[in-house]
A protein has these predicted regions:
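The feature marks proteins involved in alpha-glucan
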Residues: 1-80
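Substrate-binding/active-site clefts of carbohydrate-active enzymes
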Residues: 63-64, 69-80, 86-204
């Protein structure tokens, strides 16, 4: 589904009518990026609606994940030994499955935490991830929700915490919370937050 938002008094430089996916989506299908997502990373990717553009919320009815580790004692801050990973560049597969396959490598490093650079839905597929568009939706290029959970579960089984790097204010263009209060002087549905945006600062 998709929302069509009308504004009787739009902020200056912002469109009067926009179509956006749900800002709180946990799965986004996109006319911009989905044709570049490998089948082995996200099997059975929902098909984008014909004759539509933009992004839609897809209600995800994926199977429940059964955690092996339901309680995990995280390391104290002063004891953390963190290994930071950009999933895209860690290995050629660029996927959560790739991280799962390398668990022995992580164990041999004698680390106790892995920090994932942003894995939330971001603008495009080739990015460091610090330009999030949907903060509660995983970027499908890396894999499914359950595959990320499997990786976290496996790390916990081996005494490794997983930290998610969040970039909350680095947003523009495709974020619905930007589009509803957007600085769009060219009237092309593209821009950054306006000075009236209640969620984001104009300068990060």
């Amino acid at each position: 589904y998709q929302y069509q938002v009308f504004s009787k008094s739009p902020v200056s430089g912002s469109p009067t009518v926009i179509k956006v996916a749900d800002p709180f989506s946990n799965l986004i299908i996109s006319s911009y990026d989905d044709n570049q997502i490998p089948e082995n990373s996200f099997p059975n990717l929902p098909k984008f609606p014909e004759n539509q553009i933009g992004e839609f919320t897809f209600i995800n009815k994926s199977e429940k994940y059964d955690w092996n580790i339901t309680e995990f004692d995280k390391p104290k801050k002063e004891d953390l030994i963190i290994y930071e990973i950009l999933v895209r560049d860690f290995d050629k597969e660029s996927s959560f499955q790739n991280l799962i396959d390398r668990i022995e490598y992580f164990k041999n490093l004698n680390i106790n935490a892995i920090e994932l650079m942003p894995v939330m839905e971001f603008e495009g597929n080739e990015s460091w991830g610090y330009n999030s568009s949907y903060h509660l939706s995983l970027d499908k290029f890396y894999g499914t929700q359950n595959k990320l959970k499997e990786f976290i579960d496996l790390c916990h089984q081996n005494g490794i915490a997983v930290i998610l790097d969040l970039a909350l204010n680095h947003v523009f263009g495709r974020s619905p919370l930007v589009k509803m209060w957007m600085d769009d002087p060219d009237n092309n549905s593209w821009g950054g937050p306006s000075n009236e945006n209640p969620y984001f600062n104009q300068s990060a």
